[in-house]
């Protein structure tokens, strides 16, 4: 946990969560599929894999600008392959219990994954399905664009600047910043320390949610 205390004990109208790397870990499964895809298309795996995390599949493919490649068809292939491979997908420690403790109308998931893939991974990890979930199909532009987080706040009926976003990846952090939300960086799945001005959280077993008259707040245990 970082020494930056500003988001702790601060009341919010809602908590917004990224999915992969924030409430569940699917890095190994995703990298297995993307490695297979990259090799098939002659893309350097070592340099490419770090760029996929937190981004929509179609955006990762379009960014490469490969000649003769149908980005939509390739993204659909990626999604189907990832739906089939959920080996090793599991919750970030304490995430499921923490999410279950939240009022249903005060939290949402905002993910770059398509809805079918998101639900598959959540089921594999034991993550509860929220009333509000923004997925790849819901926005025309993915993270780092802030549209997903703004849409989640809108669907919950709250202002985005009254929300706390839980994120792990650079593109998601940029999206939350651009949206105007407060931010907590979840570091549970990071192999290397992250340099950030935002508060950090190593795992959900270290915190609990408190519902008061002014809103939902995060407290350290």
Spans of model-derived segments:
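Asp-based, Mg2+/Mn2+-dependent phosphohydrolase catalytic module
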Residues: 2-13, 96, 106, 115-221
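Residue-level marker of regulatory loop/turn positions in helix-turn-helix DNA-binding domains and
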Residues: 91, 110, 141
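N-terminal helical cap/lid subdomain that shapes the substrate entry/recognition surface
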Residues: 5-103, 114-116
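Hydrophobic residues in well-ordered beta-strands that form the structural core
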Residues: 25, 109-111, 185
């Amino acid at each position: 946990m970082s020494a930056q205390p500003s988001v702790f004990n601060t009341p919010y109208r809602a908590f917004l969560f990224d999915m992969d790397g924030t409430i569940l870990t699917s890095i190994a499964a995703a990298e297995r599929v993307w490695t297979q895809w990259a090799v098939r298309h002659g893309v350097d795996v070592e340099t490419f894999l770090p760029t996929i995390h937190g981004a929509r599949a179609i955006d990762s493919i379009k960014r490469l600008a490969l000649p003769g490649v149908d980005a939509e068809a390739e993204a659909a292939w990626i999604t189907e392959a990832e739906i089939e491979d959920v080996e090793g997908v599991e919750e970030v420690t304490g995430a499921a219990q923490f999410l279950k403790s939240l009022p249903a109308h005060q939290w949402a998931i905002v993910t770059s994954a398509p809805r079918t893939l998101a639900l598959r991974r959540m089921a594999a990890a034991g993550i509860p399905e929220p009333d509000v979930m923004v997925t790849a199909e819901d926005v025309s532009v993915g993270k780092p664009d802030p549209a997903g987080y703004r849409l989640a706040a809108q669907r919950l009926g709250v202002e985005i600047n009254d929300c706390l976003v839980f994120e792990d990846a650079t593109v998601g952090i940029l999206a939350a910043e651009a949206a105007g939300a407060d931010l907590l960086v979840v570091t549970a799945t990071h192999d290397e320390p992250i340099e950030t001005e935002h508060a950090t959280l190593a795992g959900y077993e270290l915190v609990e949610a408190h519902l008061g008259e002014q809103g939902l707040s995060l407290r350290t245990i």
